[in-house]
Amino acid sequence: MSFSRRQFLQASGLAVCLGSLSSSVRAGSVSDRKLPIPPLLESRNGQPLFVTLQKVHWAFDGTQKTEVWGINGSMPGPTIKVKSGDDVKLIYSNRLNEPVSMTVSGLLVPGTQIGGAARMMSPGAYWSPVLPIRQKAATCWYHANTPFKMAPHVYNGLVGMWIVEDEESKSLPLPKHYGVNDFPIILQDKRLDNFGTPQYDKEAATEGFYGDTLLVNGCEDPYIEVSRGWIRLRLVNASNARRYELSANDGRSLYLIASDQGLLTSPVELKSIPMAPGERREILIDLSEGEEVTITAGQSAGFMDRLRGIFEPSNLLRNTNVLTIKPTGLMSLVTDKVPQQLVVDDTQITTSIQPRTIQLQNSPPGINNARWELSRIDLVGKQNGWERWLVTVETPQPFHIEGARFKVINHDGQKPAPADFGWKDTVWIEKQSELLVELKQPSYSHFPFVYYSQILENADKGIAGQMEITPSE
């Protein structure tokens, strides 16, 4: 039996691919990269916080550095921590070669300070908002929200965590030592080429972009070493479109303590926790027994799917390990029990308010038969007012509202699952969800709030609207 030159080259190429595939399987099976912890940037004594948007060199695989976008020299950007009651001055600087706008999702500030189209920064430009922090403790995230380019700008790396702290949260017996027992976890999926460079194809992302590599703080399959006891994970899903279902590989419980807009009234014990794009969660994990555990995000691609992924783009994740946690040493001095009461919330859920209908449409893209238009206000509300929104979708997708917070009344007529308890600003909608919305901050015709599909490609296509919230007297 003889081989032609073409057959020989094909066989040789396949052998190389299979070798690479088996290497990636081996590399992905054991976590050997320590979790990168973004630097902490805190507001102190009224000093401004500098946020520089720039190109950085980053090694997603730990070896080959590639040029991406980042903030203050890192990807993701530093974790910004502020205190409720402070007025925080930011100084954004755009050192990239195209216009960008930024926002902080979850931060309840007036429309003049939130960012967006009216605060677009040209290359070389600055923007210096002063943010009045007047809300309860919460895990938020700051990111690009450049109109019609939100998806590529977030994918390129313009993301970071934003923590609001208040006296009530500081007094609770919860892990709060940043990078020691309180960890920022930013999830993104990307598609990396052979040189470790992220690839993005907007035209192929007809239903949102899905990568094949799960990254946590810009790293694939990382680990952390911690003291025995309880740890806290602050989770942000910064992916363009992918929804995750997080669980422990050994079946242990995860204790949900906070949602998008802050702490729940009491912890919720769960075996798995869904996370839609844009959602934030805070969870506690008990490591007092000293047993290693891996947090996973579902099933990874099988061998044949991996093989196909060598020759054509795949939407399946090669590895779904989020984080391996390795407890060491003696018990932590932090409380050995989950507090039964976190915060008090006496909000009365009511359905007596006249509903407002919000319909997200895919074809043609828009909300209530209108494509996102920067010069148009789509709805008007009143600051501190309460509204009932009936949000419907043609295909399942997450939905986000700026400048407001809400509670989920029901999903498709059914009570929300425990994972959707508490105050939120982002929610996954299968068909129809009913929301009790509190309009916390004012916005204006030239500085409106935006509500949109949190599948970022959908928002860029025009599934978004703008609202003006008239100031209270």
Swiss-Prot record:
InterPro entries: Cu-oxidase-like_N, Cu-oxidase_C, Cu-oxidase_fam, Cupredoxin, FtsP, TAT_signal, TAT_signal_bac_arc. It is found in: Periplasm. Keywords: Cell cycle, Cell division, Periplasm, Signal. The keyword Cell division applies. This is Cell division protein FtsP. GO terms for biological process: FtsZ-dependent cytokinesis. GO terms for molecular function: copper ion binding; oxidoreductase activity. Pfam families: Cu-oxidase_2, Cu-oxidase_3. Predicted to be exported by the Tat system. The position of the signal peptide cleavage has not been experimentally proven. Belongs to the FtsP family. Cell division protein that is required for growth during stress conditions. May be involved in protecting or stabilizing the divisomal assembly under conditions of stress. GO terms for cellular component: cell division site; outer membrane-bounded periplasmic space. Residues 1-27 form the signal peptide. NCBIfam families: PRK10883.1, TAT_signal_seq. PROSITE patterns: TAT.
